[in-house]
Swiss-Prot record:
The modification Phosphothreonine is found at residues 166, 180, 313, 322. Its EC number is 2.7.3.2. The keyword ATP-binding applies. InterPro entries: ATP-guanido_PTrfase, ATP-guanido_PTrfase_AS, ATP-guanido_PTrfase_cat, ATP-guanido_PTrfase_N, ATP-guanido_PTrfase_N_sf, Gln_synth/guanido_kin_cat_dom. This is Creatine kinase M-type. Reversibly catalyzes the transfer of phosphate between ATP and various phosphogens (e.g. creatine phosphate). Creatine kinase isoenzymes play a central role in energy transduction in tissues with large, fluctuating energy demands, such as skeletal muscle, heart, brain and spermatozoa. One of its GO terms (biological process) is phosphocreatine biosynthetic process. The lineage of its organism: Eukaryota, Metazoa, Chordata, Craniata, Vertebrata. Belongs to the ATP:guanido phosphotransferase family. Residues 11-98 form the Phosphagen kinase N-terminal domain. GO terms for molecular function: ATP binding; creatine kinase activity. The modification Phosphoserine is found at residues 164, 178, 199, 372. Residues 125-367 form the Phosphagen kinase C-terminal domain. Dimer of identical or non-identical chains, which can be either B (brain type) or M (muscle type). With MM being the major form in skeletal muscle and myocardium, MB existing in myocardium, and BB existing in many tissues, especially brain.
Length: 381
């Protein structure tokens, strides 16, 4: 890079104490870790593309936290961020991912045949099944930091790759900027499209700059395999369908994802991955598999049971409302998914969802009959 980050150099005219953010009222992982000492140490560092510690933490400074959800409070701007600012990221990663250590190795397993069961979740209770992940393309900076030209290059590369898919994956790309308001809203309501960038986390991190330039959605002809381009990550890959056949959803996810990865590799742009962090993504909460395997499941009785939260925790699952994070459950329908991302494989994480949801549906059926479920409460997984 011929010139340094002049904006950051200018900030160095002020003492660290004068630049250090006020985090006294914050409830996020970044605020727990970033002391004045650490800020002093990191503030004149930058990645090869010019991302600084102030860029890393901005979203967490502007969003003190959520009363119920401990937000992460920081983002990576490029692949090197996790290395250059490791003294900030490592404790956050450990905190967020159950004590994951800087020396730990992540494992990847995208062989769908290793998943046991998953094709027999009761569709009267499990209304839909979905598996998603994110991927970052090597050689480009990440959405909080990329330039317009980079973002457009990522879109061009992605569309070329996706348009070469055939068979069950044959599909079409729909750029956001050529969609009507109505088309866009319909896709959002169908859970096919990312929301417009109103989330303060997206806005403060810089991910929503130039919206909707170079953003879009690609999906196969029967809308069961989707790829979001240039939202929070370069790519978000999603496999979904109505009902409870998680086995089929996961098969399509693995096969489609590996086809896409192959095409990018051949084009000389593999995905960002390393042995320690697995797949490198914008938000530290998604490192590892980046995978969220979830179902919409109806639990009218179990959700009112005093041990509902404890059961979820023991099964290593988390719940969200029907519309995703920050929403309420409508008609006792919850979005239940794996809590882990880093340190265990894709197959292991989806297995936890399949086994855990199956058990919770059995509990729900017992409660419907007025029977006790005390003997079914699982041990901590």
């Amino acid at each position: 890079m011929p010139f340094g980050n002049t904006h950051n150099k200018f900030k160095l005219n002020y003492k660290p104490e004068e630049e250090y953010p006020d985090l006294s009222k914050h409830n996020n992982h970044m605020a727990k870790v970033l002391t004045l000492e650490l800020y002093k140490k990191l503030r004149d560092k930058e990645t090869p593309s010019g991302f600084t510690v102030d860029d890393v933490i901005q979203t967490g400074v502007d969003n003190p936290g959520h009363p119920f959800i401990m937000t992460v409070g920081c983002v990576a701007g490029d692949e090197e961020s996790y290395e250059v600012f490791k003294e900030l990221f490592d404790p956050i990663i450990s905190d967020r991912h159950g004590g994951y250590k800087p020396t730990d190795k992540h494992k990847t397993d995208l062989n769908h045949e290793n998943l046991k069961g998953g094709d027999d979740l009761d569709p009267n209770y499990v209304l839909s099944s979905r598996v998603r992940t994110g991927r970052s393309i090597k050689g480009y900076t990440l959405p909080p930091h990329c330039s317009r030209g980079e973002r457009r290059a990522v879109e061009k590369l992605s569309v070329e790759a996706l348009n070469s898919l055939t068979g069950e994956f044959k599909g079409k790309y729909y750029p956001l900027k050529s969609m009507t308001e109505k088309e866009q809203q319909q896709l959002i309501d169908d859970h096919f499209l990312f929301d417009k960038p109103v989330s303060p986390l997206l806005l403060a991190s810089g991910m929503a700059r130039d919206w909707p330039d170079a953003r879009g959605i690609w999906h196969n002809d029967n809308k069961s395999f989707l790829v979001w381009v240039n939202e929070e990550d370069h790519l978000r890959v999603i496999s979904m369908e109505k009902g409870g056949n998680m086995k089929e959803v996961f098969r399509r996810f693995c096969v489609g994802l590996q086809k896409i990865e192959e095409i990018f590799k051949k084009a000389g742009h593999p995905f960002m991955w390393n042995q320690h962090l697995g797949y490198v993504l914008t938000c530290p909460s998604n490192l590892g598999t980046g995978l969220r395997g979830g179902v919409h499941v109806k639990l009218a009785h179990l959700s009112k049971h005093p041990k509902f939260e404890e059961i979820l925790t023991r099964l290593r699952l988390q719940k969200r409302g029907t519309g995703g994070v920050d929403t309420a459950a409508v008609g006792s329908v919850f979005d239940v998914s794996n809590a882990d991302r880093l340190g265990s494989s894709e197959v292991e994480q989806v297995q936890l969802v399949v086994d855990g949801v199956k058990l919770m549906v059995e509990m729900e059926k017992k409660l419907e009959k007025g029977q006790s479920i005390d003997d079914m409460i699982p041990a901590q997984k």
